[in-house]
Amino acid sequence: MHENIVAAPELAGEGLQKIEWVRRNMPILRKIQYEFEKEQPFAGKRITVCIHLEAKTAFLALVLRSGGAQVSVTGSNPESTIDDVVAALAEEGLRVYARHGAEPSEMRKYMETVSYTHLT
């Protein structure tokens, strides 16, 4: 297992606040989370998410985890990656490999890394 790649772990609190705001304001996703918690449709599964990493998509990753999945996350665009949200996901126990402004070679490495987490 690879260590998380997080540019600013000290910003996790700010990221958690953003994700909590999203949670409060997305009732449909909250309902899905509730159902996933009960039904555990992804128990024992590994899910990789490669997406614009910001508060709404971070909440989606957490919803997937609430369904029992082991979730690994990377950003799909270094310019849309929000570092405090990345730090929050790591703090919440997800495997995260992303940072704002990453170079193309880094992005490739992050995408390979999230793929490797599912091969072991």
Stretches with model-predicted labels:
Residues 54-67:
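Histidine-anchored nucleotide/phosphate-binding helix
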